[in-house]
Amino acid sequence: MNGRTREYLKGRFGDHYRRASLSPPPAANEREWGYITWGDGGTTMVRHHSYLDVTGGGDLGGFLAGERPRHVYFSAGRYDDPGASSMGQKGWRGSDLVFDLDADHLPGIDPSETSYAAMLEACKGALSRLLDLLVEDFGFEPLAVVFSGGRGYHVHVRRDDVLELDRTARREIVEYVLGEGLDFDDIVSTQAVAGSAGRSSPAQKRTLPDGGWAGRVRTRLTTLFDEVLTMEEAAALDRLREFDGIGEGKAKAALTAARNNREELTKGNVDVHPAVYSIARELFETVVEAESAPIDEPVTTDINRLIRLPGSLHGGTGLEVQHLDRDAIDAFDPLSDAVPETFVGNEIAIYTQEPTTVELRGESFRLSEGVSSVPEYVGVFAMARGYASKAGE
């Protein structure tokens, strides 16, 4: 990025902060603050500052309007002395539990081949799965959901009962959300019952409990058999034979078991027939792959992590880091809703070295090689991404 481009973006970021209304996170005085400047010698991180250090006793917006940083962060950690120059001197008191979703970590997404819009849409799907796991399985409410301004989302849990979790405990939560280390037999509840049922006495009844990963598999299994029980027999058998190791005989046995034991199946009993157990085991793999959330593990386990400030601008896109209400997530379009109003309504001249396409505010802009006049928000995005530089007016 050349000097003219840097100075232009720095100035316009400052204009944004003069207009913006920013609210610091809870316990702002207990957190470390940091920011990245628009320096010409690479990335320069300024950190180990307290809230008082950065604001000088004033407000956060005034500091940002004056400093005009490229990126702004605060710590998940809370400290006795957040401005101390080393982590050991800060006196750790606890940390928010933070989850990060980024398109780079989504399975099947290649950032070099996937459009920015498609990556963000895929990330929103992963966010929905993450929130379901956090709320339904852990009971983590309230949650703070934030669009990162880049290619993903952050979720903050600030309840008192998570603040003092150490890295090991946070890693266990990560593994659960990722579905790592899960085995089907671990989620099945085993109960001794009277009789032998063809096995050693007493027999064992294996059941998928309601809730958690077991509950998800149970729901999928019940849905499957509800589906096949409404089909013609030939179609139902074909559907069941789609599962590995289920041939004609086992498919018929599973279908018969489902007809005769529908109530038990609904209760999660996977021992109504060995074929049903085999199908449930395979569904487990499918459910974990489909309903886990590909979070970035180091973000959650790092109790000292710096995370982006809502209301600030992302220096790699020019988009706003935005707090989202849970009921607004489905309708949220980051390529429209996160475009700062500061950059709307003006045209600027930019120079593009290679042709590229930018999609913002519901429109697609084809930038040809050379100098062109574009809406400022398009130019800011292209310059921040490194696609273009500022041309002379």
From Swiss-Prot:
Enzyme Commission number(s) from the entry? 2.7.7.-
Q: Where is the active site?
A: D100, D102, D296
Which residues fall in a coiled-coil region? none
Q: Name one GO biological process term.
A: DNA replication, synthesis of primer
Q: What GO terms fall under cellular component here?
A: DNA-directed RNA polymerase complex; primosome complex
Q: How does it assemble?
A: Heterodimer of a small subunit (PriS) and a large subunit (PriL).
Protein name, as recorded: DNA primase small subunit PriS
Q: Which organism is it from?
A: Natronomonas pharaonis (strain ATCC 35678 / DSM 2160 / CIP 103997 / JCM 8858 / NBRC 14720 / NCIMB 2260 / Gabara) (Halobacterium pharaonis)
Q: Which Pfam families match?
A: DNA_primase_S (PF01896)
Q: Where are the transmembrane segments?
A: none
MF term (GO), any: metal ion binding
Q: Which UniProt keywords apply?
A: DNA replication, DNA-directed RNA polymerase, Magnesium, Manganese, Metal-binding, Nucleotidyltransferase, Primosome, Transcription, Transferase
- What function does this protein fulfil? Catalytic subunit of DNA primase, an RNA polymerase that catalyzes the synthesis of short RNA molecules used as primers for DNA polymerase during DNA replication. The small subunit contains the primase catalytic core and has DNA synthesis activity on its own. Binding to the large subunit stabilizes and modulates the activity, increasing the rate of DNA synthesis while decreasing the length of the DNA fragments, and conferring RNA synthesis capability. The DNA polymerase activity may enable DNA primase to also catalyze primer extension after primer synthesis. May also play a role in DNA repair.
Q: What InterPro entries would the database entry show? A: DNA_primase_S, DNA_primase_ssu_euk/arc, DNA_primase_ssu_PriS
Give disulfide pairs as residue numbers: none
This protein's cofactor list reads: Mg(2+); Mn(2+)
Q: Which family does it belong to?
A: Belongs to the eukaryotic-type primase small subunit family.
